[in-house]
Amino acid sequence: MADPARAGRLAQRIKVLVAEALRRGVKDDRVEPVTVTEVRVTNDLQHATVYYTVLGDEATVAAAHEGIQDNRGILRREVGRGLTIRLVPTLEFVADTVPEAAAHLEDVLRAAKERDAELAKAREGASYAGDADPYRTAEPDADDAPRA
């Protein structure tokens, strides 16, 4: 078991190394639009999950995924050269869906805000259906009379 702080530092270093390797070390045009967003390392430092996003349409995303899978060995070699640990962790690349989920959440919040504005506009001219308090009467009830 490694110290969680050490695992965090290692994950940050792997993130930088993978990003640099994608930019300089890999001679594949398919991986140009790839951005590394996060790296998570297991507690035993043997496995690293690299999350990435791709700017572009579905064809670009699919091509980038294939490019990353084809160059996984080169990326691991570059990470191994940049780290000073005995065993280089295996790298697993996962497409990050957080930006799409955030965009969807923003759309839902925008729709809710528009609906709230519509309801507020409808509420402006509205009035109560009856008196202010339909249960209040002018004469006191027998139950409300003071006891002697």
Swiss-Prot record:
GO cellular component terms, semicolon-separated: cytosol
Cytoplasm keyword on record: yes
GO biological process: maturation of SSU-rRNA
Residue spans of biased composition, Basic and acidic residues class: 133-148
Key word Cytoplasm present: yes
GO molecular function: ribosomal small subunit binding
Recorded family membership: Belongs to the RbfA family.
Subunit note: Monomer. Binds 30S ribosomal subunits, but not 50S ribosomal subunits or 70S ribosomes.
Task performed by this protein: One of several proteins that assist in the late maturation steps of the functional core of the 30S ribosomal subunit. Associates with free 30S ribosomal subunits (but not with 30S subunits that are part of 70S ribosomes or polysomes). Required for efficient processing of 16S rRNA. May interact with the 5'-terminal helix region of 16S rRNA.
Name by which UniProt lists this protein: Ribosome-binding factor A
